């Protein structure tokens, strides 16, 4: 007797799944509660131009003891550099900071190099070897160097030594203290028939300053130009105006720049900084004279807030506004250069949200992102509220990742906005326990008087948290990179290229180098970048995606799976991508392999389905797709089908 299907009697096949991962990673909640277009985890994944989730691009090394296999055939111009670029760095040297220094004379990278015995600066550019900058020694205790370019000078500080700068001729120079910074005319005199002679008193030791008078058409002395600022002055010298008709002027002396400067920032043609000297009130903000980072007026400082809350970061915002991030508050200084500094407005932005790392601050479009004590926040988010409200951090969807950051090493965090992505390099604690919340170097003391210390804590950034500004979503994190300092560059021969000082974990023979991110390479759907661009220094890394936990839109009853269909793409006709597919039931986090060696052949839409009937009953099921071959993994969709079991009255 023939069997006839009955829609009223047979179990209905129910569909569930994800047709695109446009809302990114949401990992700080139950995997079955996140949206269908999100995923629980992504490691070393990115968005392509079409919104597909795809492996991030890799890196190539640009300095140090270059390995020829790292360069391969990505770009011919870069291949030619392996024999010369950076080959003169010390064998065991590591690069821990850098800056793209662009002047009218030339463009170059200035990098801070640690060769295990001495920390010093080098300079170089693609096509040339690196050369050491004489007398540019960095303090041995410094973990990084703060750079700020003002005009044709690159100022730098390490938080322990005095302020110095590199000239456009790549020469290290010290700040000349005790020079005349300005001369103000107090009495202009009258009826001057000629230009009077200006004589400035000599210093106790050093060079005597000189100046020349400026007389207006009405016969008044209107200004005195400094022709030589001199040196060695400890107090303001007297100014004698011979034949000045009663004119009188007062000189001002520029003393030494603030001791142990940190957070160097160029803003409104001034240099700004904070002092790392513990004898200085921690909310003191220093600024140089206009257009002169060498000239620091003794009165050129502001106490922001006046409450002792330490300044943790500075950022040059729009207009004349300087953002001052303190540990527990945020302020702006409206430093209009046409006003006297005493008239600048200092305004409170937020009274209970602060910043934890100066180096995490980065402009993201018209917004500014930074790392606070409770996660990554944005200025636009804060301005949308009030000065006293505290909303969720922008990073709340990935709070579990934020909790893994070593709270004793927040100063190491380094952020950059690049190609519509906010990249924040962070020091993850690599082993449990993660959530300790310590903000000092001391261990915690439990109720049982047992010391708890951070296990697996490293003195380096071993992960990069990624936010995509166009998709407005998080992409989990990238690993295999040890990022000491992101260095955005724009060499005229190559265009914009993101580089970073650091290391690649999978390249065991490498020391800390400067690496370039391969996203500058031409890459389209029909003409993709070379497959070797998905390698880090010629070595492979693992990319993986874990989907949400699917429940066929029925949260209570158990289910029996029928099949799952995965959609991939592979634009390479000469290279298959090997991936592994696994599943986990009931949000257990324990994955069992479905297919350990799926080979994705060339196709714009490669479909693969698996039978789930043999996997037994489950309430939720999620899937993990990963590759560690260094190839390009692109997951387009995950479609699940199954049957809903009966609701059990008791179990």
Q: Language-model segments: what does each one mean?
A:
Residues 1-131, 137-155, 353-356, 363-367, ...:
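Beta-sheet repeat architectures centered on beta-propellers
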Residues 83, 88-91, 131-141, 174, ...:
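Beta-propeller and closely related beta-pinwheel folds
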Residues 123-124, 166, 201, 242, ...:
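Predominantly extracellular/luminal cell-surface or secreted proteins
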Residues 126-127, 158-160, 166-169, 218, ...:
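Acidic/polar residues in short coil/turn loops that connect beta-strands
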Residues 142-174:
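Hydrophobic or amphipathic alpha-helical targeting/insertion segments
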Residues 171-180, 431-438:
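Long, compositionally biased low-complexity repeat segments characteristic
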Residues 173-255:
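Conserved, function-critical positions that sit in or immediately flank catalytic
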Residues 182, 224, 261-263, 493:
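Extracellular glycan-recognition/adhesion modules and their associated mucin-like linkers
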